[in-house]
């Protein structure tokens, strides 16, 4: 069994034979379900360099011994800030790390420390214990999402932003569901702050019977 726990905003903890933490923005996150010191991980996947995604990755990696996986340039950026943390740089494509199959896939967004561009944004497809999970990162919908299902599907659960303003809104995310064809979908990256206020029930209505929409509150988990 694999558990997907929503930690708030775009942060998730995937628990199976390994613990995989994605975009651990916890400190300063008004929706965070846990504190950084309460999280253990084997791998930390970072989708891009914005502070609400890279978050507490370094602190958690230092304490838990987790490896940080990120776009090559972002991995180098992290290494410069924390030479004692093990990083693994990628540049889109598949790999296997500690027995976990990971595909770093494109995302339409930006990636910076707020001033300087750092690498490119991405999403991740993770296969753990026979379960396939897609975390989109911050992105708009794009046609090549259909390839993710074609190459690596079926996708058991897609974690999709619906907040609009910086990412897809409910309408665009519902279109992404059509392209990805996941069995289940969990909305994320909404209602953290006023600019990304959305009603997840509207997203659920737009998806209809194309997938099962599971609306998780921070701290809740989905068992697969």
UniProtKB/Swiss-Prot annotation:
TM ranges: none
InterPro entries documented for this protein: Metallo-B-lactamas, RibonucZ/Hydroxyglut_hydro, UPF0173, UPF0173_UPF0282_UlaG_hydrolase
GO molecular function: hydrolase activity
Keyword Translocase: no
Keywords annotated in UniProt: Hydrolase
Keyword Hydrolase recorded: yes
Top-rank taxon, per record: Archaea
Similarity annotation: Belongs to the UPF0173 family.
Protein name (Swiss-Prot/TrEMBL): UPF0173 metal-dependent hydrolase TK0141
